[in-house]
Amino acid sequence: MTDTDLITAGESTDGKPSDAAATDPPDLNADEPAGSLATMVLPELRALANRAGVKGTSGMRKNELIAAIEEIRRQANGAPAVDRSAQEHDKGDRPPSSEAPATQGEQTPTEQIDSQSQQVRPERRSATREAGPSGSGERAGTAADDTDNRQGGQQDAKTEERGTDAGGDQGGDQQASGGQQARGDEDGEARQGRRGRRFRDRRRRGERSGDGAEAELREDDVVQPVAGILDVLDNYAFVRTSGYLPGPHDVYVSMNMVRKNGMRRGDAVTGAVRVPKEGEQPNQRQKFNPLVRLDSINGGSVEDAKKRPEFGKLTPLYPNQRLRLETSTERLTTRVIDLIMPIGKGQRALIVSPPKAGKTTILQDIANAITRNNPECHLMVVLVDERPEEVTDMQRSVKGEVIASTFDRPPSDHTSVAELAIERAKRLVEQGKDVVVLLDSITRLGRAYNNASPASGRILSGGVDSTALYPPKRFLGAARNIEEGGSLTIIATAMVETGSTGDTVIFEEFKGTGNAELKLDRKIAERRVFPAVDVNPSGTRKDELLLSPDEFAIVHKLRRVLSGLDSHQAIDLLMSQLRKTKNNYEFLVQVSKTTPGSMDSD
């Protein structure tokens, strides 16, 4: 190598920093005024700071980034460097490929920037992982974010390979693509940060999240007491504060609270909700106020509710305790039912009635008789798909809990009301109480399930879906007498002779499920004879468990006499004899005296 070549090489090194362009970021070495930095957007400033080696840029603001970049430039321009001539002499003596710092232990600020610009992408990826937990909250470690980081790393590696192969002329393109990649990564970090902040804000406000987290109650929060019936759905629960139907003031209950406290559907719950403070903006995504405190379940403590038995594990028995319905001399409906179809605690009775046969009046008389003669029983009247005026009449005439869903409501409301009502009755039975449920009617409930349930593809005659018959049968099958204490009595009406094939199919499904049946006759009702009871097909299974031996023998004689007559003559004879006596006891004594030969014939 001649002296001319050495001089040329030295001039190329000093005058045209072409080799340094591949390693030194030109925008950092250039003396850019502060105004040009102020015009850059935040992702560009972060990318520039990352190339300069500034760490933690994801949490910096714009003015902080500008200050950090200017500090790096001042260190690079004004630092005490090694004598320039000595460096040039050393570079001239060494081969051009060994253009490295004079000492490996110490580096000047300019050389630090060069080395940091070469390692900008690995450091940025590590900085992203380090800043992830602090910047993006609890969601920084999700699988989606890891996938984004892996894809970004692969793209960075490809960019580095292309930049290495292209040489010094493509150094600017490599840095430009690196800047775009950095901006994309920083945008991802910004999105992660926003998601993390939103998640933390939701946790602080007590908004429910996907895992059903409970709402947090602070010391300075003002609470308001609430009470209602718990309705547990698939992944959430509500306290129905306005009855058994959904309302605008229902209270949300997290599934964690339901499982932790052993809460069940139909529980009577009391607790508290947080009252929004003055000037506090309501959460637009939070439609219902969450329950922040649980005080009692079914009038008892929460610990007692965890120890209660399950309704399905209780032992069912035949009814053995009678519910007497006779109230007064002139109330013949209940007197006839006591003689023809005696009812016990835990009975599953059906009142089979054609239209306009007086079934609603019979239900009212039964309800009033139960509240008068058996005040220990909890009475619930469930009216499904009923006329609004009949609901009002029932509420005013019955001293009990009337749960209604009128016919102008959608079928889903009919089914939800019936399900929540029977679940409420089960919760009372688990406490050892006697509950009587009067349902009007099981046929209309079957219609509602047929209209509300999705089609299964198997349609029976009359357009009845096969899956729509099970839920009302489950409702009726809940009636039972519990050996451990408590009972659930269900008296439901079933409509026949309506001219609808679907009603006939529904009735045939329930025909063998009841253990007591009271059949009404339309022809008797057309003669204006009430109650229009068809005596011969009506009766109770295992009625000897409800009647005393003497009473059972006399009733047996009476039914033998009435069986020889047609339905019209039988009810006329029975009604005429009941009007002559003050009560059923006197009537049975009279029957035993007037038919002595029947006992001998037996």
From Swiss-Prot:
Keywords: ATP-binding, Helicase, Hydrolase, Nucleotide-binding, RNA-binding, Transcription, Transcription regulation, Transcription termination
Binding-site residues for ATP, renumbered to this chain: G344, K345, G346, Q347, R348, A349, K356, A357, G358, K359, T360, T361, R387
Bias (Low complexity) ranges: 172-182
Ranges for region Disordered: 1-35, 76-216
Gene Ontology process terms (BP): DNA-templated transcription termination; termination of RNA polymerase I transcription
Compositional bias segments (type: Basic residues): 193-206
SMART domains tied to this protein: AAA, CSP, Rho_N
GO cellular component: peptidoglycan-based cell wall; plasma membrane
EC top class, as a word: hydrolase
EC code: 3.6.4.-
Biased composition (Basic and acidic residues): 85-96, 183-192
Keyword Lyase: no
Activity control, per UniProt: The antibiotic bicyclomycin inhibits ATPase activity but does not affect termination function.
GO terms for MF: ATP binding; ATP hydrolysis activity; ATP-dependent activity, acting on RNA; helicase activity; RNA binding
Domain (Rho RNA-BD): residue spans on this chain: 223-301
Miscellaneous: Was identified as a high-confidence drug target.
Function according to Swiss-Prot or TrEMBL: Facilitates transcription termination by a mechanism that involves Rho binding to the nascent RNA, activation of Rho's RNA-dependent ATPase activity, and release of the mRNA from the DNA template. Shows poor RNA-dependent ATP hydrolysis and inefficient DNA-RNA unwinding activities, but exhibits robust and fast transcription termination, which suggests that the transcription termination function of M.tuberculosis Rho is not correlated with its helicase/translocase activities and that these functions may not be important for its RNA release process.
Protein family membership: Belongs to the Rho family.
Subunit field text: Homohexamer. The homohexamer assembles into an open ring structure. Does not bind NusG.
Comment block on domains: Contains an extra N-terminal domain, a S1-like RNA-binding domain and a conserved P-loop NTPase domain.
Stated name of the protein: Transcription termination factor Rho
Organism: Mycobacterium tuberculosis (strain ATCC 25618 / H37Rv)
